[in-house]
């Protein structure tokens, strides 16, 4: 019997994944930390108030850049997800009871950090009658109430595509409603067994029909083929997706899905071009791009492309439109030059 480091018995899929060693990264999977005054200010505020963000706790490679833009991400609903995805490092199992005071605390954290844009994400809560819809909506409302000049992005589960639950979330009026598709139909059930490809598209379509700015994410390197990525992008565009992020899968541990391929920056650029051609309004594509990376900038870009004015209280987000993005594929090519084929091999560490 295989067990985890904390003594838990491994799931069958985890034991199978663990047979493949952790992979060695190619040269373009690198970060360069540049620390500016906004980052230092937020870091001092977080440390002084004992705050917690996904940015720090997940060791996000883009924390310096996002905090310099005064953006951060918060995980709500607890630390245990009622579903398991083969790429995700959040533990799965029976979640703890809901913390009804969490919306207030998150909103106060946003105020304490002086954020211009906040992304709210969280675990799936199939154990609750409303699957956590109240919580996702209430956090948005509280942030807007205490922080009228802060944009809010709500990155949610699918709420089983129940219209009455989606409406609760939509009515909270986040600047962006996000639901991540993550991968292509052929391998979807293997990677996200508790989700459904078509259902995720229907959730995005519902948000689009409601009138919200919509967003999704694709993770590459889990076994998909290049042409399948293009087809998934088209599906997202047809569902009314305004913003798309595309990223390289990085394996959290040996118990997670092995990396099938390292996707070159050149291919990320091709997918970005395809997304724009298919009508998606704002795209960020690169190996270390994450779904909340430069989120305020992407919101502002999407609003402009939709022909809509950015609200006066969020005009400051326009300042980010011309800033450089260190993790976009085009920037990586300028930094490292053309890529060579990099087969997936075991790490020497």
Curated annotation (Swiss-Prot):
Superkingdom to which the source organism belongs: Bacteria
Q: Which cofactor does it need?
A: [4Fe-4S] cluster
Q: Which SUPFAM superfamilies match?
A: Radical SAM enzymes (SSF102114)
Catalytic activity reported: [[Fe-S] cluster scaffold protein carrying a second [4Fe-4S](2+) cluster] + N(6)-octanoyl-L-lysyl-[protein] + 2 oxidized [2Fe-2S]-[ferredoxin] + 2 S-adenosyl-L-methionine + 4 H(+) = [[Fe-S] cluster scaffold protein] + N(6)-[(R)-dihydrolipoyl]-L-lysyl-[protein] + 4 Fe(3+) + 2 hydrogen sulfide + 2 5'-deoxyadenosine + 2 L-methionine + 2 reduced [2Fe-2S]-[ferredoxin]
The terms under GO molecular function for this entry are: 4 iron, 4 sulfur cluster binding; lipoate synthase activity; metal ion binding
User: Which SMART domains does this one have?
Assistant: Elp3 (SM00729)
Principal cellular location given in the protein's record: cytoplasm
For this protein, the record's HAMAP family field holds: Lipoyl_synth
Q: Which family does it belong to?
A: Belongs to the radical SAM superfamily. Lipoyl synthase family.
This one is known as Lipoyl synthase
Q: Which organism is it from?
A: Corynebacterium jeikeium (strain K411)
Its gene? lipA
């Amino acid at each position: 019997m295989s067990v985890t480091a904390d003594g838990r018995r491994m799931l069958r899929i985890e034991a199978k994944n663990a047979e493949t060693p952790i992979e060695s990264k190619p040269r373009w999977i690198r970060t360069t930390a540049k620390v500016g005054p906004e980052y230092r200010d937020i870091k001092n505020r977080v440390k002084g108030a004992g705050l917690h963000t996904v940015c720090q706790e997940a060791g996000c490679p883009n924390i310096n850049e996002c905090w310099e833009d005064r953006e951060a991400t918060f995980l709500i609903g607890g630390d245990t997800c009622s579903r398991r995805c083969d790429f995700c490092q959040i533990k799965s199992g029976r979640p703890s009871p809901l913390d009804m005071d969490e919306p207030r605390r998150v909103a106060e954290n946003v105020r304490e950090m002086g954020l211009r844009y906040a992304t709210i994400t969280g675990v799936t809560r199939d154990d609750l009658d409303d699957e956590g819809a109240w919580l996702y909506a209430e956090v948005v409302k509280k942030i807007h109430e205490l922080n009228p000049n802060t944009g809010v992005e709500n990155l949610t589960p699918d709420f089983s595509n129940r219209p009455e639950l989606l409406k609760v979330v939509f009515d909270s009026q986040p600047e962006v409603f996000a639901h991540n598709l993550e991968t292509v139909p052929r391998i979807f059930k293997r990677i996200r067994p508790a989700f459904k490809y078509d259902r995720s598209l229907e959730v995005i379509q519902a948000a689009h029909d409601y009138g919200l700015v919509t967003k999704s994410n694709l993770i590459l390197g889990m076994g998909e083929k290049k042409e399948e990525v293009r087809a998934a992008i088209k599906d997202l565009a047809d569902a009314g997706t305004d913003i798309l992020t595309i990223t390289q899968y990085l394996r959290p541990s040996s118990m997670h899905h092995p990396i099938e391929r390292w996707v070159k920056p050149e291919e990320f650029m091709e997918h970005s071009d395809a997304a724009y051609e298919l009508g998606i309004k704002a795209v960020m594509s690169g190996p270390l791009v994450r779904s909340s990376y430069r989120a305020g900038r992407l919101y502002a870009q999407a609003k402009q492309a939709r022909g809509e004015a950015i609200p006066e209280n969020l005009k400051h987000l326009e300042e980010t439109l011309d800033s450089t993005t260190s993790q976009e594929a085009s920037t990586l090519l300028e930094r490292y030059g053309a890529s060579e084929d990099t087969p997936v091999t075991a790490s020497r560490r």
